[in-house]
Amino acid sequence: MKYTAFARSWFLNPDQPALEGYPSLYEGDDKLPALEASLEEIGEYQRRLWANRKQALLVVIHGPDTSGKDSLIRTLATYADPAGFHAWSFGRPNASEAAHDFLWRVTPYLPAYGQMVAFNRSHHEAVIGERVWPVRDAGTYHWPARFEAIRNFERHLVSEGTCVVKIWLNLSEDEHKQRLLKRLDKPRKRWKFDRSDIEGWKQRTRYQAFAEEALAQTHTEEAPWFIV
């Protein structure tokens, strides 16, 4: 993906050079944060959120297939109080969902005050995946209006006390290919393989282009994107 300087960038590998347009958060002698300590801190804040019941947290996790969305959510869940943590996954809209406006299907799953909710894909799929695989006549889509609707929707959530954190899990072409092959080669991962994975690989270039546009259009001060 060709990056432009619209989102905050976080590199898990301190030796990885900054991508064009992004200063790395790890420079010079900076060290990676201790993962275990960071996760325990997240868990502590999540429990405080649950006890306080005055605000909510929505974590939107996006990225191509095999980018690690499920794994990230499982890790967060391990350190969270299960009473106040929920996770939901959004794939291709079904017939009922496609018959409504695109925000309709995510609205019932938004966090209540005190809750932390993680979305594996989300309303943003309506301006990324749906551009590659439309669920209705292509001529009926108006993408600028959808971008504006998402910005307004997230600003509304923030104004009402929901913190919106959006994470894009970036994946190089080579790593994407290797992870797809692992799904076939390793028995314990084979259950995750689907024919749609092949189609997703074929459409990778288009998907990445639409993703870059979507991230640029929906990155706001209130609800920024973080690229990992």
Tell what function each PLM region has:
Residues 29, 129-148, 157-209:
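A glycine- and Lys/Arg-enriched "phosphate-lid" helix/loop adjacent to the NTP-binding pocket
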Residues 41-51:
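Pre-Walker A adenine-sensing motif
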